[in-house]
């Protein structure tokens, strides 16, 4: 398992592992306000998420851990999060549970960021196999403020060592939510969450990380690994699979209303992407691959500089939309066109409510 974790990191660094599908942020326009009637200094990007304050609405999404070399990566990422006062998740902690010698590669995140928002991470297959006490163990491992329970059926199905049995997941998730005393987030890992899935869990979980198509595609990551091991790379057949991130945010929000926190991850690459994630109705954005590559290429300082520029872009976009708070972004007028418009029309999502209403209220409940 250690080597698999490192192979994942190497694939993400050196290979083209991004989805052939777009997150469809390019199909969203925030309507410009020539007269925003707002001082730039009065634009407040702070939010509270799972009981912790973030200086701006971004989480460094969980990526790695479980191999000795990944511990130093997580240490650097935690230092970035601490300096910027944003959230951070860890990669799947399955390896840390099975191998005590690599627990430190996860624990280092809380050591470096004692007061910040930290999300633990474990998969539904492991919770079904080991029971809800496993959730308690991974939360305790990083002294987490919230628990991300990831579902990655596509990745498991194409993975050499995968476990593609996805039966009974909703019941497992409900049992976990009753067991732990921190908020639980259902986390997709690159294929998105549909309205149908959101309906299954909206009365169970505290949040949904849509993990939409358009960013890192873990089926492709597994295809890279399969080729390296001389196996047929099945994952390439699913390089454009999934619900695009922009569509997933709207689908999930349509059925959960304002009852759950939504984290928009999947292909978030710029501050404008973050602004569109917020405008579509998410509470917060998540970014993984660009942060990983930046911290490895330029260290903590370079990564901090990069994310500060992201934050500046978001603040400018909020000013140009006439919004003094993140919450206001969900009700700014937007224009939706192209593939996203076609998706919404095919899925019966009312475009008038999407474009002119408060997208946090829900309309398909």
Swiss-Prot record:
Chief place of localization: cytoplasm
Binding site for Mg(2+): 156
NADP listed as a keyword: yes
Superkingdom in the source lineage: Archaea
Entry binding sites for substrate: 4-5, 92-94, 155
Location of the protein in the cell: Cytoplasm
Swiss-Prot/TrEMBL cofactor(s): FMN; NADPH; Mg(2+)
Catalyzed reaction equations: isopentenyl diphosphate = dimethylallyl diphosphate
Keywords (A to Z) from UniProt: Cytoplasm, Flavoprotein, FMN, Isomerase, Isoprene biosynthesis, Magnesium, Metal-binding, NADP
GO biological process entries: isoprenoid biosynthetic process
Annotated binding of FMN, by residue: 62-64, 92, 121, 187, 216, 267-269, 288-289
EC number: 5.3.3.2
GO MF entry, a single one: oxidoreductase activity
Enzyme class: isomerase
GO cellular component terms given for this protein: cytoplasm
Similarity remark: Belongs to the IPP isomerase type 2 family.
HAMAP family: Idi_2 (MF_00354)
Function of the molecule: Involved in the biosynthesis of isoprenoids. Catalyzes the 1,3-allylic rearrangement of the homoallylic substrate isopentenyl (IPP) to its allylic isomer, dimethylallyl diphosphate (DMAPP).
Subunit record text: Homooctamer. Dimer of tetramers.
Matching PANTHER family: ISOPENTENYL-DIPHOSPHATE DELTA-ISOMERASE (PTHR43665:SF1)
Protein name per UniProt: Isopentenyl-diphosphate delta-isomerase
The organism of origin for this protein: Methanopyrus kandleri (strain AV19 / DSM 6324 / JCM 9639 / NBRC 100938)
Gene (UniProt): fni
């Amino acid at each position: 398992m250690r080597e698999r974790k490192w192979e994942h990191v190497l694939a993400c660094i050196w290979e083209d592992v991004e989805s052939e599908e777009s997150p469809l942020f390019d199909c969203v326009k925030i309507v410009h306000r020539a007269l925003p009637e707002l001082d730039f200094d009065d634009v407040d990007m702070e939010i509270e998420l799972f009981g912790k304050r973030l200086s701006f609405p971004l989480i460094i999404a969980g990526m790695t851990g479980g191999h000795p070399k990944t511990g130093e990566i997580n240490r650097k990422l935690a230092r970035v999060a601490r300096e910027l006062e944003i959230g951070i998740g860890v990669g799947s902690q399955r390896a840390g549970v099975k191998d005590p010698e690599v627990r430190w590669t996860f624990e280092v995140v809380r050591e470096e960021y004692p007061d910040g928002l930290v999300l633990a991470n474990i998969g539904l297959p492991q919770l079904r196999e080991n029971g809800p006490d496993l959730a308690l163990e991974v939360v305790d491992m990083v002294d987490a403020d919230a628990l991300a329970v990831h579902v990655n059926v596509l990745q498991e199905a194409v993975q050499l060592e995968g476990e593609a049995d996805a039966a009974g997941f909703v019941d497992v998730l409900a049992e976990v939510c009753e067991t732990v005393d921190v908020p639980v987030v259902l986390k997709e890992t690159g294929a998105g969450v549909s309205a149908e899935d959101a309906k299954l869990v909206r009365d169970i979980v505290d949040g949904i990380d849509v993990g939409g198509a358009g960013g890192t595609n873990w089926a492709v990551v597994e295809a890279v690994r399969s080729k390296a091991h001389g196996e047929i790379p099945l994952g390439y057949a699913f390089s454009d699979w999934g619900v695009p991130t922009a569509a997933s945010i709207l689908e999930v929000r349509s059925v959960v209303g304002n009852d759950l926190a939504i984290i928009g991850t999947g292909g978030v690459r710029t501050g404008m992407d973050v602004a569109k994630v917020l405008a579509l109705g998410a509470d917060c954005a998540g970014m993984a691959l660009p942060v990983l590559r930046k911290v490895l290429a330029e260290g903590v300082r370079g990564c901090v500089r990069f994310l500060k520029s992201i934050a500046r872009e978001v603040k400018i976009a909020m000013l140009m939309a006439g919004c003094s708070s993140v919450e206001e972004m969900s009700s700014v007028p937007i224009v939706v066109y192209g593939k996203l418009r076609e998706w919404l029309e095919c899925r019966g999502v009312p475009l008038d409510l999407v474009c002119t209403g408060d997208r946090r209220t829900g309309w398909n409940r």
